[in-house]
Design a protein with these regions (language model features):
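Hydrophobic beta-strand residues in large extracellular and virion-surface proteins
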Residues: 22, 87, 97, 144-146, ...
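N-terminal leader/targeting segments
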Residues: 1-88
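Short, surface-exposed linear segments at secondary-structure transitions and domain or protein termini
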Residues: 164-169
Length: 192
């Protein structure tokens, strides 16, 4: 069982996924001991956050920026599956899980399937979005419905190719229990 599966399966809890239920998730290293106030949010459902790291299965070693600036800048080797993890929620419960990995992996469904049990389903529900912040068409953002046992989750996946930052780019996977209809309409995506 992968670390990502163990984290997203906690969203299935009937009475809500309490912050403390994530405390001892195998394979997750938390940066904070508890949720922190989110000053960037104006939504009650993301008024708190907690960050950590986990390793996605099925990736090898790659070069990434070492974090230094200017003449000191260099690269270091890490497993491409090393990913940042952010939980977002209200004061009591987690409502969404974001996973951000270095490097562009546009085959979103394949990456997610490697992390979930064999019986899981990953079904594309929207893509070919009409607009992004830069004003052009967004061919990269995709939305999925994920079925695991008798439970349903939704996934928004997108990439940033690193253009302009000279970095390797990254891929973000955002898991929620709530259907992202509003977000799909906002991005003018074609529903399937």
């Amino acid at each position: 069982v992968t670390s990502l599966y163990q984290v997203v399966s906690l969203l299935f809890v009937n009475n809500g996924a309490s912050w403390s239920s994530f405390d001892s998730t195998p394979g997750v290293k938390w940066r904070e001991a508890s949720p922190q106030p989110n000053p960037d949010s104006n939504s009650p459902e993301s008024s708190n956050f907690r960050e950590g790291t986990l390793l996605l299965d099925g990736f090898g070693m790659v070069d990434v920026p070492d974090g230094n600036q200017g003449a000191e800048a260099g690269v270091k080797k890490i497993n491409e599956g090393e990913s940042g993890l952010t939980l977002n929620g209200d004061a009591q419960n987690v409502h969404s899980i974001a996973v951000k990995k270095f490097y562009v992996s546009p085959e979103y469904a394949d990456v997610v399937r490697r992390q979930l049990p064999v019986a899981s389903t990953v079904r594309l529900i929207a893509g070919d979005c009409g607009g992004n912040i830069a004003g052009g068409p967004d061919t990269q953002t995709k939305f999925y419905e994920i079925g695991i046992k008798d439970h349903q989750l939704f996934l928004e996946a997108y990439i940033d190719d690193g253009e302009g930052s000279r970095g390797p780019g990254y891929t973000t996977f955002l898991f929620t229990k709530v259907n992202p209809d509003k977000r799909i309409k906002e991005l003018q995506c074609k529903e399937l």
